[in-house]
Amino acid sequence: MKGFLLLLSFMTRIPMPKTDYDEEKLGKSMKYFPVVGIIVGFILLFFCIIFNFILKNISYSAVLPLMIIVVILTDLITTGALHLDGLADTFDGIFSYRSKHKMLEIMKDSRLGSNGALALILYFLLKFILLFSLTIESREAAVYAIITYPVVSRFCSVVSCASSPYARGSGMGKTFVDNIKTCGLIVATVITLLYTIGMLFMPFILFTNYSLPMQFMIRSVLIIVIIVGLLALFAFAFSKLIERKIGGITGDTLGALLEISSLVYIFLFLVIPTFFIG
């Protein structure tokens, strides 16, 4: 529990009781990173519900863009832009096309470069467009994606930690890389699959008169398993690509992967179901 509280306080801006820092416990708690995503997902849902209630008398088409902005801003505030900072730093370093040592130096620089700025602009544009498109396609699917993408994206970070060595001799990310084991990856995988599949059945739990054809439910579970599997492969490939560039992963690349995989997840959620229609 202490390790998880440390992880939650480190990875979010959620007020937490003061806990003595323990590097080993923090590192070993990485397997529970998807649980942090569950908490973030429900925070996003909560603010969506509040915002929708406040503006319930305004037309849906007018509220939708604002709702998506609320989701993006809530995510940003909840995490303190920690992972976005990693995204910008990673793009500044990798796309400098310098030596491994120089790339790592650039990534440690707190100043925002042109590549990092471009990455952030593209990230926000893509996230808005993808969430908007998914909501137009299906409101239910959009709500599901909002409460699950924080989980799956954090699962990808766990996959990365288990896939590649740490690029530097020291650093916060090294704590997670050194302490994540195969059993930790299995725990994170089980949590992710149980949650993403379990949320499909939530309407049945909340509403006793809610029913859907069994074939539809089986197909939905299959889609989720495929998407999570593809994201795991993406995380592995991303980690190996970064490893070739700088000799391993860093805390910045973990943050970059988290944010990029959230976009890939929403994109796959738009595309993969089309192969099962008919």
UniProtKB/Swiss-Prot annotation:
Q: Which UniProt keywords apply?
A: Cell inner membrane, Cell membrane, Cobalamin biosynthesis, Magnesium, Membrane, Transferase, Transmembrane, Transmembrane helix
Annotated localization: Cell inner membrane
**InterPro entries given for it?**
CobS (IPR003805)
Which top EC class applies here?
transferase
From the UniProt record, give the pathway where this protein acts.
Answer: Cofactor biosynthesis; adenosylcobalamin biosynthesis; adenosylcobalamin from cob(II)yrinate a,c-diamide: step 7/7
Cofactor(s) demanded:
Mg(2+)
One CC-aspect GO term: plasma membrane
| Catalyzed reactions per annotation | alpha-ribazole + adenosylcob(III)inamide-GDP = adenosylcob(III)alamin + GMP + H(+); alpha-ribazole 5'-phosphate + adenosylcob(III)inamide-GDP = adenosylcob(III)alamin 5'-phosphate + GMP + H(+)
- Highest taxon of the lineage: Bacteria
GO BP terms: cobalamin biosynthetic process
Enzyme Commission number(s) of this protein:
2.7.8.26
Topology of this chain in the membrane? Multi-pass membrane protein
Is Membrane a UniProt keyword of this protein?
yes
A GO MF label: cobalamin 5'-phosphate synthase activity
What Pfam families does the annotation carry? CobS
Annotated transmembrane regions? 35-55, 62-82, 116-136, 141-161, 185-205, 222-242, 257-277
Q: What does this protein do?
A: Joins adenosylcobinamide-GDP and alpha-ribazole to generate adenosylcobalamin (Ado-cobalamin). Also synthesizes adenosylcobalamin 5'-phosphate from adenosylcobinamide-GDP and alpha-ribazole 5'-phosphate.
Query: What family is this protein classified in?
Result: Belongs to the CobS family.
Protein name, UniProt field: Adenosylcobinamide-GDP ribazoletransferase
Origin species, per record, is Fusobacterium nucleatum subsp. nucleatum (strain ATCC 25586 / DSM 15643 / BCRC 10681 / CIP 101130 / JCM 8532 / KCTC 2640 / LMG 13131 / VPI 4355)
